From Swiss-Prot:
It is found in: Cytoplasmic vesicle, Autophagosome; Cytoplasm; Autolysosome. It comes from Sus scrofa. One of its GO terms (biological process) is iron ion transport. The gene is FTL. Residues 1-59 form the Ferritin-like diiron domain. This is Ferritin light chain. Coiled coil: none annotated.
Length: 78
């Protein structure tokens, strides 16, 4: 959860920087941020959120088994 929170904070900082670039009419900065950072951040945040949701679903009486299956079936494919 902490890692997801950090990624969301980083994404917000990049969005703020993009807004500043737009306000200052700097298309090169905006293009650079869009192509190299913003799209990837959104994908990463989505993936982390999905993994976190799956881990929450797997927690329960047999949390150890759920975590094992999560690692085996999900993280090995990334």
């Amino acid at each position: 959860e902490a890692a997801l929170h950090l990624e969301k904070g980083l994404n917000q900082a990049l969005v703020d920087l993009h807004a500043l670039g737009s306000a200052r009419a700097d298309p090169h900065l905006c293009d650079f941020l869009e192509n190299h950072f913003l799209d990837e951040e959104v994908k990463l945040i989505k993936k982390m959120g999905d993994h976190l949701t799956n881990l929450r679903r797997l927690s329960g009486p047999q949390a150890g088994l759920g975590e094992y299956l999560f690692e085996r079936l999900t993280l090995k494919h990334d």
